[in-house]
Each structure stands twice: as structure tokens, then as C-alpha cells.
């Protein structure tokens, strides 16, 4: 979903969307930025797991840079025109990290045309941004088990909202991030609520 980005690029521009070595790698790259350097963040397009996640990450990186590299800059090249809890995040950034974070929506940057991983350059219609460290989170989709089960329609799995069963197979229940659950965000709270709906339905089916 991001031209020029690939699985091989993860070592240079970690997505760090899973815990463990990717997160450690990203932290190391941020700490090793030159003084006054630039960090570039590319969030994923909708829908994706944990809508506030990329912006929480930016906040954490800004906190780290404020202590270790206060003249550094963070540029967010967002594929979305707006994001979750935007007003709160932008007010917090202005209060705690004034002048450090610049959020650019697609109308401003015109879209990412290419990423040169070797030179750490992000080409957009607006400009070419050179990063000293970067995190790219590409578009997401349901896991391979959903594809293997044949309950997906494209990248995600349509469900019957009354009981969370898959529209493609009522004997299979799809919960959480993989499901297309109307306006419910792909969050832990949503998954927990959906699990209770599915469990109650299954219990009803078993007990009559």
C-alpha cells in the first residue's frame, strides 16, 4: 500500500506494529538520530487495528526526543484526511512538544509516490522528505487463517452483527480486528464486546 516499501524494508523502517524486536529496533533508530534530525511516520489507511495507535506512537517518540534530541522534528505523512481523537492529540502535541510535530494530510502532501529505503527519502507531490529514522505502517488485512477459511470478502470478513457469525459461513465466528463490524473500531474493547455476543449466541444454540 506504500510504493517502495516491502517486507525487506522493515529492518530500515520498522512498522513495530507487533511487540518485541521491531519495537526495540525502532527505539534504537530513534535514539541514534543525529541532533536536529527528522523522524518520518507513515500511518496506515483505514481500517486498521487500534485507530489511535500511530499517534500514540508519535507522542511517545516526541517524549523521547524532547529529552534526548529536543531540536529533532517529526513529520507525519498521513494517507487519511483525519484520524482518531485528532483534536486531543494535536492539542497535546502543541502543549507538550511545540514546533516538533508536523502532521500532513493527503490534500497537503499529495500522496506518497515512492519511498527510497536506501536513501531514507519519501517522495510526495509536495516535497521529498529525507528521514534520519522512520516508521512505516502499511495497510492491514485479516489474518491468513481467515483467507484459508474463505470467510473474507477482500481484506476483511463481513459478519452478521447479531451474533458475529461470518456471512460466508454461519458456523464460523469472526471477532475483533478481522471482522467488518459496521462502525465499531478495531479495538480491544470492541473485540471483548463481540466475544460476549458470540459466546451468548453459541450458548443459546447449544442449550436451546
Predicted features, each with a name:
Residues 2-35, 129-193, 204:
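FAD-site-proximal beta/loop scaffold in flavoenzymes
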Residues 44, 79-81, 177:
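Cofactor-binding loop segments of dinucleotide-utilizing enzymes, especially the Rossmann-like FAD-
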Residues 63-155:
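A Rossmann-like FAD-binding core segment of flavoenzymes
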Residues 197:
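Acidic, glycine-rich loop-and-strand cores that form catalytic or ligand-binding grooves
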